[in-house]
């Protein structure tokens, strides 16, 4: 029931089963990795320090989101874009078309799982290295820490716990976009500007003109709200 789900969110002793799902991750690495991502994505990648993360998106020319992701800068020239509801293979193949002469390699990061950890003291926006991957905190109604990890034993997922996890995303206003909804919603419609994931002053990127026009002139007719 909804009451049980809410109780699971706020009782510290209840946690989502360790292995949440296979993690869909696009890896961008190379000398030009940061510059390439900065030119393609609507978030300010140049402002992302090493071992930090931010929410980002890749827009089409009409300012509609192809995908929404968590971008981790795990090394100076290595980025991981975790797609909570997207296809890494699709996004990597599409991004590869824009590499041209950039010194960058775009690929699907294989073998990673998303794991729910005990809440940690990691500062918001920071990434901590772990023996099998990286961990960071996500916003929600209660503290929660996740780990992008290799070599995780698959576990049977509890439907109620997964529902609690999804509800936490909704309550935090995280607009994870399923691949079937790609290129249907503008950055403002998804609330990416509210999350600081759609920059107005970083320079040109696909869809930047639309993002700026909707911000300064208005005209956006959609917005994400939580109604219950």
Please give the residue ranges for each predicted region:
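Basic, glycine/lysine-rich polyanion-binding surfaces/domains
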Residues: 1-228
């Amino acid at each position: 029931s909804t009451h049980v789900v809410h109780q699971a969110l706020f009782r510290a002793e209840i946690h989502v089963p360790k292995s949440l799902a296979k993690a869909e991750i696009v890896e961008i690495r190379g000398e030009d990795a940061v510059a390439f991502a900065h030119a393609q994505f609507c978030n300010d990648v140049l402002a992302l320090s090493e071992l930090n993360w931010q929410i980002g998106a890749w827009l089409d020319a009409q300012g509609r989101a192809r995908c929404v992701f968590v971008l981790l800068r795990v090394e100076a020239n290595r980025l991981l874009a975790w797609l909570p509801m997207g296809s890494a293979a699709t996004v990597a193949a599409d991004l590869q078309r824009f590499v041209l002469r950039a010194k960058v390699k775009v690929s699907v990061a294989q073998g990673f799982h998303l794991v729910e950890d005990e809440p940690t003291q990691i500062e918001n926006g920071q990434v901590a290295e772990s023996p099998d991957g990286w961990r960071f905190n996500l916003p929600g109604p209660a503290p929660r820490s996740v780990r992008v990890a290799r070599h995780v034993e698959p576990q049977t997922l509890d439907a109620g716990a997964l529902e609690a996890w999804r509800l936490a995303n909704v309550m935090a206003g995280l607009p994870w976009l399923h691949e079937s909804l790609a290129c249907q919603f503008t950055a403002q419609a998804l609330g990416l500007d509210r999350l600081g994931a759609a920059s107005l002053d970083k320079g040109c990127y696909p869809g930047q003109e639309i993002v700026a026009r909707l911000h300064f002139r208005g005209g956006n007719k959609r917005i994400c709200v939580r109604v219950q």
